[in-house]
């Protein structure tokens, strides 16, 4: 009962608990800025290793919050988070591709919105599996590195990098 001196309702409490993971997930969206990136994003192993570490950190730091967000958000204002995030990421990637095309005219950006959408859905599948299964850190590192390599190779092929 005293907690409601600080929060107006259960949903506000829930959102406050999940705020750190939400901030990190949205930071991933906003990191897609063509003005700040080069074509090497598709070929640079250092960038790929950074991506691997970001996912490891996300799951390691927020496993419980991710579980709540992905599996226990029904009835809250975050129950549609996955689809809202997927839509936001799809729009952001589309704009990112347009910016990259301006910098690198030879790039093929004629990729369907649905494929971009599906790529974000795969991200949630990856996060769900890592949250549900207690994968050892070494295995997680290898698995995420494989995922990033697979994803990067696919984008390189589709975009004619």
Give residue ranges: language-model regions.
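Helix-turn-helix
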Residues: 1-12, 16
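Sequence-specific DNA-binding recognition helix
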Residues: 10, 39-44
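Alpha-helical structural segments
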Residues: 12-35, 46, 50-54, 80, ...
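Amphipathic alpha-helical segments that line or abut small-molecule/effector binding pockets
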Residues: 22, 42-64, 121, 125, ...
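Solvent-exposed, amphipathic alpha-helical segments
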Residues: 24-35, 65, 122-130
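Amphipathic alpha-helical packing segments from all-alpha helical-bundle domains
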Residues: 30-31, 54-61, 76-102, 113-124
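Short linear capping/connector segments at secondary-structure termini
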Residues: 35-41, 69-76, 105-108
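Hydrophobic/aromatic-rich alpha-helical bundle segments in the mid-to-C-terminal region
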Residues: 67, 100-150, 158-161
